[in-house]
Amino acid sequence: MAAAAAAKIAPSMLSSDFANLAAEADRMVRLGADWLHMDIMDGHFVPNLTIGAPVIQSLRKHTKAYLDCHLMVTNPSDYVEPLAKAGASGFTFHIEVSRDNWQELIQSIKAKGMRPGVSLRPGTPVEEVFPLVEAENPVELVLVMTVEPGFGGQKFMPEMMEKVRALRKKYPSLDIEVDGGLGPSTIDVAASAGANCIVAGSSIFGAAEPGEVISALRKSVEGSQNKS
């Protein structure tokens, strides 16, 4: 039987104090974060506009942490080389804009030393990403959006857990990430469905004790894995 994918807690830096990004990143790592989740939006694929490669490059000078980059952009291939040079660790693109070129995209991401992942919006059937996980040159992570991508602080969509369950049943050792509305009140549902990578923004950064939230998220994932 394949080993369970390790629990990974990834604070969403979109919810951090951008004026003190390096200090916020350091604080999250000290409090137990495994990854730092970086949302890159172009104002086209989603209405919001956030950061790009220059911010990743600046942050990389101050941290050795795994920078988990989620590309909510129309042309992800344009970002591969700049983000690789900037020091990105993971590069997760959206299937909705990559249906015709995902093989080439995965190849270029790996060639630049980054870890490829694929994400899907709430309205996209989970079956669309199966070929990318099963390919000869596969993605190594699937990100299931549990809100409509673009803005933080939205309400968690529990119906998306059907996608997580389907993925975990087919791929026992795959990194399955969930993003949107995750916190102490919703983590158990996500963890029991099979998610092992947890992105959380406002529930961590808005907490009086962010380290306790990170610890609670991890315990929920590990507890669910021990039951299964």
From Swiss-Prot:
InterPro entries, per the entry: Aldolase_TIM, Ribul_P_3_epim, Ribul_P_3_epim-like, RibuloseP-bd_barrel
Keyword Zinc: yes
Gene Ontology molecular-function annotations: D-ribulose-phosphate 3-epimerase activity; metal ion binding
Subcellular location, record wording: Cytoplasm
SUPFAM superfamilies recorded: Ribulose-phoshate binding barrel
Annotated GO CC locations: cytosol
Gene3D superfamilies from the UniProt entry: Aldolase class I
Positions annotated to bind a divalent metal cation: H37, D39, H70, D179
EC number: 5.1.3.1
Binding site for substrate: S12, H70, G150, F151, G152, G153, D179, G180, G181, G201, S202
Note accompanying the cofactor annotation: Binds 1 divalent metal cation per subunit. Active with Co(2+), Fe(2+), Mn(2+) and Zn(2+).
Reaction catalysed by this enzyme: D-ribulose 5-phosphate = D-xylulose 5-phosphate
Pathway in which the depicted protein is active: Carbohydrate degradation; pentose phosphate pathway; D-xylulose 5-phosphate from D-ribulose 5-phosphate (non-oxidative stage): step 1/1
Cofactor(s) demanded: Co(2+); Fe(2+); Mn(2+); Zn(2+)
Keywords linked to the UniProt accession: Carbohydrate metabolism, Cobalt, Cytoplasm, Iron, Isomerase, Manganese, Metal-binding, Pentose shunt, Zinc
GO biological process entries: carbohydrate metabolic process; pentose-phosphate shunt, non-oxidative branch
Tissue and organ expression note: Predominantly accumulates in roots and seedlings.
Catalytic site positions: D39 (proton acceptor), D179 (proton donor)
Assembly: Homodimer.
Family: Belongs to the ribulose-phosphate 3-epimerase family.
Protein's UniProt name: Ribulose-phosphate 3-epimerase, cytoplasmic isoform
Organism: Oryza sativa subsp. japonica (Rice)
Lineage, top ranks: Eukaryota, Viridiplantae, Streptophyta, Embryophyta, Tracheophyta
